[in-house]
């Protein structure tokens, strides 16, 4: 089957597929319509010449290459293309003598398919060889990185740096060229990110090696920390280069990276649990320990971390972990409540505390088992990939030694481990069956090679058979590992809400548990937010979480009993919708407040650490101060990371922003201990320039990463909400300052004033970023003016705070300080107002009745008509046109069967309302009667009805599962598009058109009444609509004043042309198989799967483009000539 992961392959296959599509249509015309097929001798001769040239170049490459895999894989592709070309030539010759020949038509279609498939195989084989060249360079760098461990002198370091530089430059150049060639945007981003990380780490590596050499040669303290820094950097660079190697080998987008992320998350959770277990048990053992102190918080954090692990598990394992967490949480609440009432030493309280302590041990064991199982499966999966890679080299070499057979046996052993851990017996048996077949084939091949017959045709055929079987085994084991994990919910809030909504609307549809997983993810985030809240706020959020949990369980129970469409289920679904909205709003409010607090000052702790590290050797308590500040810095970094993760999970960020936050949080967690180590080296080597430079390098890297994290967090939350939260926090700080002055507490006053200054500076930073992001001159000017005014109020407030702290009883100084504080509040309010200018009331208020004047004067009479003239007739109302089905233009080719069917569906659908919540039976006659009456009276149909049609293909009963994936994808896009009227909005009109066309393609692919021509033409029509969506989206982006939104829109819409081109090629491949009996089921299924995957990607990309275009249209230039009208079909306020 064709693959299109590079622009070169796509550009070659597209014209080939276009020509093949013409041959396919000719074949069908001869087969169905009985038409004579014209003379094809000349075009087939041209194809033959092109194929001969391609094969000649390929054979020359094979003769000169040292790549054994290329030598093995090229000959079968040559044979496939040459055979297909021979069939075409034979078909042309037979048709020349008999234009109606049936065998000739069969040769024509089989040869066409073979040309397309064989050309794809040749191009893919060439491309894989090019990838192996890049991988060899990457592996060379990996090997040289290990040499860093033996560099112990400055001379060796200089030599090492000189040797590493050219190789790194070559790798960077090759990766840059490769990423530009890739068609998968995700792969490009992954390669660029990993390569950028390697580049950033290179100076850190040199610095770490330099400080290690310096401390070792001078025999100073800090060698252990320097060694940790160096090893960390080497391991980090190696991991990124290994990730580059993995991505280079991908030919389709896969979500396989989740396994390593989940393993890493489980390990981190387990480490966190272990570190807090003693503190938690200490609190439980002490009946006099206060509720809410560090010990109780440790228990909450343990349950939180264990809950994260539970969410990563499936089936019984998941239920046990989450059930234990919930039970222990309730028991901890009871213990805390008893202690708050002074009954901590009572037998009931002591017994409960002991039960919680024992329960924590049980929970820890469950978490360890879950982590061990996932790690075992992941390790086996990765081991299989490496061993199969080595085995393929052995299979390609007829004279290979016995080590290749050992690699295959090793891969089979790892696959057996995965089979044993499978919960699904069918999957387990399927893997075990494959193991037996591969083992037998490998033994037979090894015997032939031991007999010196490794180069015989039989041995070569066996080698190819084993290679294919190993690839199939890898696919099966990968699927088994993926199926052992729970359904993955979206990574961002809106995605989870959408998944949850789809399940709530259709609880009886099997969505593989995605909808419920999304709801569980939202509830889990709610619990995490509640853990850092106190008092009634915490109880309120937990109550909302429990309410959503209960309603979800009740709805799922009804659906399981087949009552998902009952009145009770519909009532539950409505309640669950409302509860989810409440939970979402409360979570976002809590998260915004936390971001406002935690991110008000990100760099002071690291600056204080730097001061402690550079303290003079004779400074008092030098070591103790350093340890305290290092602990504060680590704690602060942890808070930043945890809060950023909550912003990613609960904020309004898109997928790329969420992934960016997660990456920066991971980097911060890795860098923090390295910064502390670098600071400790500097502390123990005062005055050492190399130690100082190394610490500065590590510190700057940490600060740069946190600044990036802060920017992404600001993107993830609503700016206006953040400013509101910051303003409220400043008011509270000012109230604390009043209390401090009243109680004569200067330190409390200074703390409050410092907090006010930090929050004000944070607001300035947010405003500065928004000004840089915008190209709207009025907005920039307004925000800049408000920011300048705020900036001028901070220093006077700080000076007034210092003055009043020195003489806190002076009423005059107190008044000056409070006046300064209120000026800051006023300036903050102006910044906030600049982000949300006052809009006129909607609807406008009624006029003042007192201003109305009623008189008895009659209106002047109409002037009489000229004598003898008759009044002209009333002009007819404007003709109502169906935007989805524009009139055919002269010379335009339209897929007639599909369009006729679509028009019939459209006419039928006009009889029914598409407004939600109105049963068809209630509106059928009334709506039609009203519409007919309006038409008869000469009045236009009301605007509400102007584009209320839903093609029947997209109106499947919502209570029935959609088993056709292409149709499901079309419905998903259609649901998104029908939120808006398409009057005056060409993007919405094109999106609806695409949804209809894709629904038609679903019918054609399923073997409906359509033809090969219809399938090919449908794909072309979809591509045409895709081009229109892309063009319009780029126009919107060009006029958008928000740089961030513009970039998002362009990134989404740039995927569409590539995917639509691939759809045309795949449709041609599928068309060559329709009605053919000599195609294997496996080959036909593979073609269908690729077409389905492509269609889903296209629908998703258009859906995202519609959303981003709507967001971009809000920030359109005021002088833009290009506008789109965004009018909701169902207004948000109804």
Swiss-Prot record:
Residue segments, region 3 X 112 AA tandem repeats: 259-589
Region (Disordered): 857-887
BP term (GO), one: morphogenesis of an epithelium
Annotated Gene3D superfamilies: Alpha-catenin/vinculin-like, Vinculin, Vh2 four-helix bundle
Sequence repeat copies, ranges: 259-369, 370-479, 480-589
Location of the region described as N-terminal globular head in the Swiss-Prot/TrEMBL record: 1-835
PROSITE patterns in the record: VINCULIN_1, VINCULIN_2
Name of the protein: Vinculin
Organism: Homo sapiens
